[in-house]
Swiss-Prot record:
One Pfam family cited in the UniProt record for this chain: Ribosomal_L20
GO biological process: ribosomal large subunit assembly; translation
GO (cellular component) term, any one: ribonucleoprotein complex
Protein name: Large ribosomal subunit protein bL20
Function: Binds directly to 23S ribosomal RNA and is necessary for the in vitro assembly process of the 50S ribosomal subunit. It is not involved in the protein synthesizing functions of that subunit.
Gene Ontology terms for molecular function: rRNA binding; structural constituent of ribosome
Amino acid sequence: MPRSKNAVASRARKKRILNKAKGYWGSRGTILTVAKHAVDKAEQYAYRDRRVKKRTFRALWIMRINAAARLNGTSYSRLMEAMHKKNIDINRKALAEIAVKDPSAFSQIVKTAMD
């Protein structure tokens, strides 16, 4: 009985890794073993950074809200406390967008919350 080498599956596996490594510098994009390590590491970074992205954007929204709140004579923490007490439910993403795109509307929100 002839030896079975499973060439189709192994070639597909190698091709999948090298396609993911396309565009990598030097041997990282051409040599299978090096490319495999590079792709594995890239996928680890991608997995981690999909989670870090959420934290980063929340921090950015808070910075923008704080800057706009200080232009209106209050701080981020005092503004959020006042909004919670008045049951003004606007999430940070939307509030940051309003602060950047429509400062007069943001001023009205601050005035409503602080009164």
